[in-house]
Amino acid sequence: MLTPKRVKWRRQHRPDRAGKAKGGTKIQFGDLALQSLDVAWISSRQIEAARIAMTRHVKRGGKVWIRIFPDRPITAKPAETRMGSGKGSPEYWVAVVKPGRIMFEIAGVPEETAREALRLASHKLPCRTKIVKRQEVGEAGEG
């Protein structure tokens, strides 16, 4: 599972949930990609589950790129603990995903196979998604 190697601070404030993605909204590596339509916290376990679903479907062919990284710690206090006594300890890591963010890319397999792999991955994620295709230079919508 994905976690940062080292962090400056063990505990962070809760991430902001408003607005659209500032960067990471264009396909950089693959031919097809999975794009977020909602704001969501995606845990390292969910990212790993989606990756496994994709790689199992494409078998040995193709390449998958993960474009998000869980760099925010989410803390929790133990059950039945009274309020106070400081902030809880980090439980898991999340990637803050906003609308428009490209989360996964895939290449090297037929389009139908890639679409199905991305569809399977989308079922493992807590947000609505859409599958987008790389626009070739000179196609509509560019320029």
UniProtKB/Swiss-Prot annotation:
PANTHER family: 50S/60S RIBOSOMAL PROTEIN L16 (PTHR12220), LARGE RIBOSOMAL SUBUNIT PROTEIN UL16M (PTHR12220:SF13)
Keyword Lyase listed: no
Assigned protein family: Belongs to the universal ribosomal protein uL16 family.
Matching PROSITE patterns: RIBOSOMAL_L16_1 (PS00586), RIBOSOMAL_L16_2 (PS00701)
Composition skew (Basic residues), residue ranges: 1-14
A GO MF label: structural constituent of ribosome
NCBIfam families, per the entry: rplP_bact (TIGR01164)
Keyword Transit peptide in record: no
Annotated organism of origin: Desulforudis audaxviator (strain MP104C)
GO cellular component: cytosolic large ribosomal subunit
Quaternary structure note: Part of the 50S ribosomal subunit.
Residue ranges of coiled coil: none
Function in brief: Binds 23S rRNA and is also seen to make contacts with the A and possibly P site tRNAs.
GO biological process: translation
Any one Pfam family match given in the protein's UniProt record, by short name: Ribosomal_L16
Alphabetic keyword roster: Ribonucleoprotein, Ribosomal protein, RNA-binding, rRNA-binding, tRNA-binding
Name by which UniProt lists this protein: Large ribosomal subunit protein uL16
Region annotation (Disordered) ranges: 1-23
